[in-house]
Structures are given as structure tokens and as C-alpha cells.
């Protein structure tokens, strides 16, 4: 299973091999900005799709994996400032510069939620199990229940509100695991990274960044051992979330709302602001991009750049987004417009009353597998073959035992005869 890098610029988007750097596919006519693109493998249409909100207006481009040109152009109710999709493929969320939050049901295109929830521009959206988190330049982090959003949008209020940041929040990462064990990481222009517990809504730790650095983006490895902060200077700060204790081994840093100063460990190669970060599946490689068009692949154990990704036709367009994916589930056949299934158009107006609506569900083709009857027959034949072989071995052992008994009886008879002769001679 290979890994790919998907990245977007203000001129297009590409997918390249993470380890070789070879170009896999290219998407044309894409003009986007940071936090305005998301690649989704699991979609109602059954095809992996790249969603990319455009910077020139209230428009979103949808790209099919095996098609270079735009597959769908969707008119939005407002120009977006950030975009996110749930990994299950059910929800698509967008935030605007006015502070409005939009949530669509992808299978129907229905706009289930639309409201101004922040005082300033929404900067980042992220889904977790049953929750949607939104951050803004107003320094607040809000958590929303997706169930309440879909069932009672008029009276829906944030179930989580975090206001400890002093300046605008620029990025947010949601950790893995179920909701009760999930941690949320936020980074702000107040030069702090804060770690939150979703279950208790408590602030766990505050990590202060160097005064000379202004954070722009954030990444956390899947095991939540290390976080990486991209900065406007081009540096990437690496912050370990565990310390080594001589008595107890590894211990987590901070806790109890404590403040921790980040170390001076930095990955230095970019000469301009880092715009996006992404980690490989095993967290041994870090992909970073900047606003001058450079994309670097870092080998984290050695903290060296192992590869630089070149844009097509030697262009150097500002990179706005990077994401790592695996090739599992990606189609290999060519794009066929006759069989391709398109998503329903996203609605721009929220319905006042709940109503029945159709949803798009693509039934996947039947996979070629061994029939149950054939499998059962093979098991029966195997058991029968094993039984016949075992019975033959039993018969063979019984014959050998019978021969041994016969030989023993003959030897005993000879021994008794010789012993009697010896007794008479005495």
C-alpha cells in the first residue's frame, strides 16, 4: 500500500508519490487558499473527490480522482474562508469571513445548518465522532453536536466553548479515538498551543512558543507524541508531548492547565511562511509547504529534508494545502462520464421546516470472491483427505504393534527354553 501527497496551489492541484516524488495525477483550474481544500475517499457518489472552495467568489470546484478538469462547479451561498468534511462522507462544512457556519448533507445537498456563530472570520473547521469544531479570529473555539445541528438547527447552541486564547486561532487538530478520549489541539497568534480534553472540556496544557515565531499551521502525529508548528519565518517547531522520567519512564508534559515552554528544536529549510503540514501514516515523514511553492519531505528521525517535490512545468505557485493519503480504495480505471455519479448540488438556502428528501447512495459492484459453496466443499474435501490419511496411519501403527508383539512372544519363548536348559545342567 503506497502513500500519496495531495497538494493544492493557486493554479491547480496535484497528487504525487510520497516516497519517489513521481507525479500521479493533476487537477486543473483550481484557485484556492489555505484551509479551503479537502480530499475525501469515502463519498456518497462512491468516487474519491477533491473539494476546493475558490478564492475569486462563492464557488466550489469538485474534482473526480481520474479526471483532470473540474467535474462539478457548485455555487455557494457565500464566499468561504475554510472547508472541512467528515471522514464518513456524510457532512461538508464551510466557514465564511463574516463568521457564518454552513453544514451540508452531501448525500442530498441539503443545507442543514446556516448561522453566524463567530464575530469574525472562521479560520478552521474539523470533525470528530459526533462533533464539529470551529475556530475564528475572534479567539474562540466552539464545539457543535452534529445530531443537534441536523435535528434542531434553530435552537442549536455550541456544546463546547473555549475562550482562553487571547488572539485569533489559526489552526486546530482533533486527535483520534472515541469522543470521551479525544484531545483537541489549537494554535493561535497569541503564540500558544493549547491542548483540550473533549470529555471534560477542560484545558489540559498550554505550550508557549518562542516570542520571535508567529504560528501559521499545526500538525500532530496519530499517537499524539509530538506536535509540529509551522511559522511565518519558515521554521517548523517540534514539540514533544512526553518527557523521560528516571523513575516512571515516559510522562506527559504539562497537565492540570499548566504552562510549558516549548524547546528550541526547529526544522529549518523554508525561507518563507509555512502554509501547511502533513504527516505520513507511520509518522516518520513530515510534509511541509510554503507560500513560495516549495514542498519538502522531512525524515523525522534524522531531521533532514529527504526529498523536495517539484511542481509541474517547473512552476513555483504558492502551496495552500497538503494532505497524505494511501492508495487503498483509489480507482484504477479511467474516468467514464457515462457511468460517473455526480453529487447533488448543494443548496444555498436552509429549509425552515424538516422535510423528507432523497439521498444519493451508490451501490458498489459485487467483488469477485470465492462462493460459500466452493469454500465449504474445499473444507469438506480437506477434512475427508485428512481423515483418510489418519486412518491409514492408524492401520500401519496397529500392524507394526502386532509384529512387535509377535516378535516379543517368539523371543520370550526362546529365552524360556534356554533358561530351562541352563537350570537342568546345574
Curated annotation (Swiss-Prot):
**Pfam families, A to Z:** WD40
Q: Which organism is it from?
A: Yarrowia lipolytica (strain CLIB 122 / E 150)
Gene Ontology cellular-component annotations: heterochromatin; nuclear pre-replicative complex; rixosome complex
**Keyword flag Nucleus:** yes
Task: Name the family.
Answer: Belongs to the WD repeat IPI3/WDR18 family.
Q: Which UniProt keywords apply?
A: Nucleus, Repeat, Ribosome biogenesis, rRNA processing, WD repeat
Identification of the protein by name = Pre-rRNA-processing protein IPI3
Family matches, as InterPro entries: WD40/YVTN_repeat-like_dom_sf, WD40_repeat_CS, WD40_repeat_dom_sf, WD40_rpt, WDR18/Ipi3/RID3
SUPFAM superfamilies found in the cross-reference section: WD40 repeat-like (SSF50978)
* Protein localization: Nucleus
The protein's assembly and partners: Component of the RIX1 complex, composed of IPI1, RIX1/IPI2 and IPI3 in a 1:2:2 stoichiometry. The complex interacts (via RIX1) with MDN1 (via its hexameric AAA ATPase ring) and the pre-60S ribosome particles.
| Alphabetical GO biological process terms | DNA-templated DNA replication; rRNA processing
Lineage, top-rank taxon, reads Eukaryota
Function statement: Component of the RIX1 complex required for processing of ITS2 sequences from 35S pre-rRNA.
Give the WD repeat ranges. 75-114, 117-154, 164-206, 269-308
